[in-house]
Every structure is written in C-alpha cells, then in structure tokens.
Amino acid sequence: QEGDYQPEIKVFELCEEIACLYTQPADWQELCRRFGIGDKLKNAVKSLSGGERQRLFIVLALIPNPELVFLDELTTGLDAKARRDVWRILSKLKEDGLTIFLTSHFMDEVEALCDEICVLRKGMAVFYGTVEQAKAQSGCEKFEDAYLRLSGEEDAA
C-alpha cells in the first residue's frame, strides 16, 4: 500500500522505468491523465499527496497491460470523489476485459466493482459467490450487514 522509491524520482521517470520493462506497455501518460495525475508528471513522487500516490500505484500496476491485476485496498487514502473516479475508470477497464482481484474493507467498493466475492473468516473462505447470493444466504438486505454476518464480525460490531 506504500511504495519505496528513490527519494527524488519524478512521476514520469518512474512510469518510464516501469514501461521500458515491457514490450507493449500501456500509454502511461494517458493512464496518469485518466487517474487525475497527468499534471503531476514532473513532480517528485514523495511530493504527491497520499491520494495521488495511491492513484500512481494503480497506474504502475496497469502499465504492463495485464489481463489480471491485483489491487490491495486500492482506494485507501482517497477522498469520496477520487474513489468514485477510480471506480469509474476500473469499471471501464473491466468492461474492456481486465480481470481485477481486489481486497477491500469498503463494502460499497466491493459492491460497485466485484462480480464475484469471497468472504474470509479467520483466514478461511466462508463464502464465495455474488453480492446478491451473500445477501440471500445471510438473510440480510444490505451487503455490509451480510458481510458482517458471514465474516463473523457482526457480534464484534
């Protein structure tokens, strides 16, 4: 969730370094623009806000043009508008064929982005299916309530 890069490396330098490792990288400048950091290319990574760094890390994950991307707590540190913008972009990438493996503690994010979910309890999978199936199996109307019940966190809440 936090990158460790050369202290003074600039956004464009980091993106170029990643892109040069791949034969057909994505257009990282376009990705930066889409993720709202296109005007930060000459800034040092360390000077970016937490939300800007988080969006940069998503861009870095997408530069290789993957068919599958793993995103861990991808919107941590983002404000509500930035979260929605990231969701919109990722939804479009998903429509274009990108498979997203997402870990999140934000159930609204899971509901918005995930076709299938896996709920864990003490490191063990206790549910696999859709959000609607989770609500039906748990007897809850809201997905967050279903998650809490299935994960065993309901009593702790």
Feature-to-residue mapping (PLM):
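ABC ATPase "signature
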Residues: Y128-G129
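Hydrophobic anchor residue at the start of the ABC signature
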Residues: I58
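Catalytic Walker B motif of ABC-type/P-loop ATPase nucleotide-binding domains
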Residues: V69-D72
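A short, surface-exposed alpha-helical micro-motif characterized by mixed small hydrophobic
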Residues: V110-A112
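Conserved ABC ATPase "signature" region
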Residues: E16, C20-K40
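Conserved ABC ATPase signature
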Residues: A44-L48
